[in-house]
Every structure is written in C-alpha cells, then in structure tokens.
Design a protein with these regions (language model features):
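Conserved, single-site charged/polar hotspot
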Residues: 1-437
Length: 437
C-alpha cells in the first residue's frame, strides 16, 4: 500500500481570492501572485474566461504554497471566525450549488501534520500526539473507503428519516461527494500550514507513519471527541444503526467500577448528577492546554455542566434553530438514551406542536445557539403560578458525542505514563494497530 492522497474541501464562497506564493501550473502555463475566481452563470470565472473546474499544480512541491483569503473556521460554533490560511499541495476549484468550492489535494501524512497541529496544542505529550496521529489517519482512510462503498452501492444512502411526529437526523461526512472530507470540525479541523507544526508533531507522525487501527480486516472508523463524560458512547446511537465491536460502552477509567445501565432514565439522571472518577474528570490546566486551543479553553465546565433558559428564550431558540414552530415550549421529554446516557431521541412538547427529534447532534443543535456540549443531560423545570413552565435548566455530562477516543481522557493517560498503544486500545476495544505503508 502506497501513501494515499486526500482531497479536502476548505471553503465555499461565490468569490474566492487567493495568492500563489510561488509558481503554480494551470492549463499548461505558470502563474503566481494574487488571483481571484468568482461564480458566473454556474461556472468559474478567472482572468475573464469561464471554466467548469480549475486546478493549480505546484511547479515545485517542496517550496510551493498558496494562501486562501477569509476562510471561515468553526462553522456554526460560538467561536466562528474568518482567517487567511496557507496550504501546500495542489489547489482545485469546482462549482457546487451557488458557490465555488476550494479543494486542497495533498498526501495523507502532510495532511495529518496540519490536523494534529490544528486539533491539538503544541504542548501535548508525544504519546498523546502519536495516538492522535493513528486515529486521525485511520478515520480519514476509513471514510474514503466508506465513500467508495456508498458510491458503489445500489442502495440510496440517507442520513435522515422524517415523519409528522418524528425527525431523526445524523451528521456525518457523507455530505461530501466531490471531495473526501472538509476542513472544519464537521470532519477534522484542518488549517493547512497556517499554524506552524512543531518538531514533536512531526516526530509523532513520523514514528507512527502508515499505522492504522484495524478490526476484522477493515480500517477502524476511529471517532474522537473532547470528553466522554466518564463512559464511552456506542456508534449506532450517534450515526447510522451500525454496531462496531471496537466502539462499545466502557468506563473511561481503569477502576473496576460497574457501569449502571445508562439507557435507563433513572440511572442516567443519577449518573449525570454525580461526578465520578474518570480519566477525563480533570481541571488540570497543564493537561487541558494539551487538547484545547485558545478558543476551546473558553469552555471551563465540560465534565459536568448546566445551561438555563427561560421559557420564552427556549421557545424562540428552538424556532430559530429548527425552523419548526412548536409554540410555547411546555416540556422536553427523554425518549431514548445511549450507553453513555446521551439522549438519542427527545420529545419537544409545545402549545402548537409535539415532535420527537434525534440523534444526538440534532438535539444539541436545536437546543443551543451553536451546539450544546453534549446530549447527555436531564431537564429540571421551574413551574409558574399557572402550572406552566417559566424556566428550563439542562444539566449535562461531557463534551461531544463521546464515541471512540476521549481527547481529555487520553491527555490524562499520557500524563500518567501510558504509551500511545495502551491509550488507543483503551478506547478502541479489541482493535489492533497495523503498519500498512
């Protein structure tokens, strides 16, 4: 197996300005300097001519780089912002809908250098970085394989089922059909060479080059999130109804504590009310700074957290985020939970409409201006004099979907002296680590 290439969708705008910092070849000629493309009649206009697609290949791959202006990062998150970003590799433009998509084409190991630098802090330990290199590489190649399977299948792939009384939707990278993955948190945070990689990141990638998590002869769909909240979630409760043997419930701890059945409502509420010992139950800034970039460090309480809305605030928020008018919200009723206590289905009861929504990210998107920290929460209602709720408090656990590697837990394990293989096999139960190229 040779090192694969990857195509990354970086930005989506009707007009894109970019700088070729050295020579790039396009349509047989060499170009450099400031350029711009814009949408024109469903095609790409550049230098007064229109094209279905454009590709700029570096004249010298060792030194060539390009800069994209005003790339949006943190799309739909509370810290969404624009920044100029620098990339190596090739640059391709295509048209999708009413926008031009800028795509970066490059080798997997070069891509990983950016992902690890973007996802992790430069202060992270070598073992944590090595573990992250293996899961990021595995996740990426598993997604490419999955996309090929979906493309070759005669069955229509859908991430949503909807009826009058229920909307079940999950969010995965299958939204992307003309490139492998996107550059935002929807896939993996990728910012080219904008943030200089450190020697330790290069070392972690070099030491694990070509290593993949494998299970039953296939590359593992190696998911990760910030904090599992003490128990791992299972894949099928967050995405399609598919059970993977290596993504199963387990305590984020080496203790022998028995996990209560958190799919049972009473147990889930009691679990969230507690703050049990776990690898990811930490307030150690030295550890947290290894995982959280500056804008993530704005989040202080993540292992156990609380959010409060007045009835009016919640009603307006749900209308704005879902586009569905439930009227005044009367109740939020848990219908189904996963193995970590995360809600898979939630019933929204309003004066105009009642509906069940899921899965976990749909719930998180509907109940927050950006994303709730997780769907592992229970609801406390404050009742008014007319027996109508005047406020709702959501009390929750963890940060993210909780499937696979828990980044904060893994950082703590690294600090405690576990090596990267021990960290990986704690989170991906029964998997193996194989060098494939």
């Amino acid at each position: 197996m040779k090192e694969p290439k990857v195509s990354v969708g970086v930005m989506f705008e009707p007009k894109i300005e970019f700088i070729l910092n050295s020579g790039f070849i396009c349509n047989g000629a060499e170009y450099s300097g400031l350029q711009s493309v814009k949408l024109s009649g469903g095609k790409i206009e550049w230098l007064g001519k229109v094209f279905d697609e454009l590709i700029f290949e570096p004249a010298d791959g060792s030194i060539s780089s390009f800069e994209l202006k005003d790339v949006t990062i943190g799309i739909n998150f509370h810290w969404e912002r624009k920044e100029n970003q620098l990339f190596k590799g090739s640059l391709k433009f295509i048209v999708e809908g009413e926008k031009i998509t800028a795509i970066n084409l490059l080798g997997v190991e070069e891509y990983l250098t950016s992902v690890i630098s973007s996802e992790m802090s430069a202060t992270a330990s070598l073992e944590l970085l090595k573990a992250h290199a293996v899961i990021s590489r595995s996740w990426l190649l598993a997604q490419i394989d999955k996309n090929i399977e979906i493309t070759n299948s005669s069955e229509k792939y859908s991430t949503m089922t909807e009826s009058e009384g229920e909307l079940i939707r999950w969010y995965d990278r299958e939204d992307h059909t003309r490139f492998d993955i996107c550059a935002d948190d929807h896939c993996q945070r990728y910012q080219g060479i904008t943030r200089a990689s450190t020697p330790i990141v290069m070392d972690a990638i070099g030491q694990t080059r070509g290593e993949l998590l494998m299970s039953e002869g296939k590359i593992c769909d190696a998911r990760y999130s910030k904090s599992c909240g003490g128990v791992f979630e299972e894949f099928q409760y967050c995405w399609e109804d598919k059970k993977y043997p290596y993504l199963v419930k387990q305590r984020d701890s080496k203790s022998d504590t028995i996990i209560p059945d958190l799919t049972v409502e009473k147990n889930a509420v009691e679990w969230i009310k507690e703050s049990p010992e776990s690898f990811c139950n930490t307030t150690d800034n030295k550890v947290l700074s290894q995982v959280l970039n500056n804008y993530d460090q704005e989040t202080v309480n993540f292992y156990r957290w609380s959010v409060k809305y007045s009835q009016k605030e919640l009603s307006q928020l749900i209308l704005k985020r879902s586009g569905t008018d439930y009227g005044d919200i009367l109740d939020l009723v848990p219908i189904e939970r996963g193995t970590s206590g995360r809600l898979v289905k939630l019933k929204i009861v309003g004066t105009k409409r009642t509906r069940i929504i899921g899965k976990e990210l749909e719930i998180r998107r509907t109940l927050s201006e950006s994303h709730l920290y997780s769907s592992a929460f229970y609801v406390e209602k404050e009742m008014g004099s007319e027996q109508a709720p005047i406020a709702f408090t959501l009390k929750g656990a963890g940060w993210g979907h909780g499937v696979g590697l828990c980044q904060i837990g893994a950082a703590v394990m690294g600090e405690k002296g576990y090596n990267y293989k021990e960290i990986l096999l704690h989170y991906f139960i029964g998997a193996t680590i194989n060098k494939m190229y």
